[in-house]
Regions:
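Acidic beta-to-alpha connecting loop that harbors the catalytic carboxylate
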Residues: 73
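Histidine-centered nuclease catalytic patch
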Residues: 32-69, 77-82, 89
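Polybasic, low-complexity binding patches
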Residues: 59-64, 76-119
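Short cysteine-rich loop/turn motifs with clustered Cys
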Residues: 1-47, 70
Length: 119
């Protein structure tokens, strides 16, 4: 279950963007700009909590398996792992739609493997 504490902790893990207040703005794993108060909203800066290792594959709500992701990137990622499609990125002034194929980085994949290797 996602609690307010979890939302806060996941937000704190998201990337800091130079020139933007980190209490209000962060960058998701796909490079999209997200705003703290837009959690759960369909908005140009809205975001959701992504399960890096999808729940349908045995992933759960451990903080190491969670990350902030722009809602459109999360929806395009679906249950794909480790490779997935992202559709929004930040161009330095605003979010723009740009389809890209991405892969969860090696460090994160090793951590996920340690968490879920026996499942």
């Amino acid at each position: 279950m996602i609690t307010e504490d979890t939302i806060r902790d996941v937000w704190e893990k998201a990337g800091i963007v130079d020139g933007f207040a980190p209490t209000m703005y962060r960058r998701d794993a796909c490079g999209a700009l997200i705003m703290r108060d837009k959690y759960g909203k369909v908005n140009p800066y809205g975001w959701e909590i992504d399960h890096i290792y999808p729940q349908c594959m045995g992933g759960d709500d451990q903080l190491d398996n969670l990350r902030a992701m722009h809602y459109m990137n999360n929806r395009s990622k679906r249950d794909d792992y480790p490779s997935y499609t992202a559709v929004v990125t930040f161009d330095g002034t605003k979010n723009t739609q740009k389809m890209r194929n991405l892969t969860v980085n090696e460090t994160t994949r090793r951590r996920i493997n340690e968490l879920y290797q026996n499942r």
